[in-house]
Amino acid sequence: MRIEIAIAVISDLHIGSTVALFPDRYALPDGQILRASTAQKWILGNWNNFWSEFHGIRATRKAIIVNGEFCEGVHHSTPQIVGTAELMEEIAVEVMRPHVAKVDELFVVKGSGAHSKPGGFSDEAVARELGAKRCPSFGTRSSYRWRISAGGVMLDCLHHVTGSGAPWTKGNNLRRAVLEHLYTSMERKERPADLLIRSHVHAYGHWEQSGCHAYVTPSWKLADEHAHKIAPGSLLPIGGLFVLINRGRAEVIPRLYSPQTGKASTL
């Protein structure tokens, strides 16, 4: 059965991090070969499975939403990176190009300044190279916010969302996002979105209120040194979302891939 619209939603690729999505092999201009680690090969395998499933969906129109942060960037003196921000952008283009070529539109949301450069210029550079859709307000290839009307379904896409780190406060960030959105939409006399897409914190979540569904997307990055500090012991799944739209209704399918806990040592 062919549906009207299929959208793949991904975010926080963090390409350039030593613990994030990376090609199996990448040749630098000077001839040095960078190769994916064992962990990165696991991420890449799931990435390939995600896209194989998405490209197999029969739809009249297809799109990709990258909800911020193609690249890790050079930040906070971290040693867990592979090179310059510009190199990361080149790798991101190579990783994304085969999938962008198979869809009708690419929408790019700007991420945080730490990863995406001030003003989101890293996301903008990759978006421009990939021919992403222009923002109707500013003419740029990326934007901090996208409101997308797709087959009668309104999506509201922003990279940032507040955190909800402790298990007993899980979901508070989504509840806040939905209620703030509904309130401000009412104040502005705007139509509330059917789907809120948020990212940044890498922890998948979903909450619904009054027909407004909010989702936080997972990332394509495992825990780095900073994550081990602020959330010790956490094992967040990686992955993305499929949004399938037919007859004015949306079905959101999360695709989550969970890393395994490390083997225990024997005394």
Kindly give the residue locations of the regions a language model identified.
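Conserved beta-sheet core of the metallophosphoesterase superfamily
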Residues: G151-D156, V161-R255
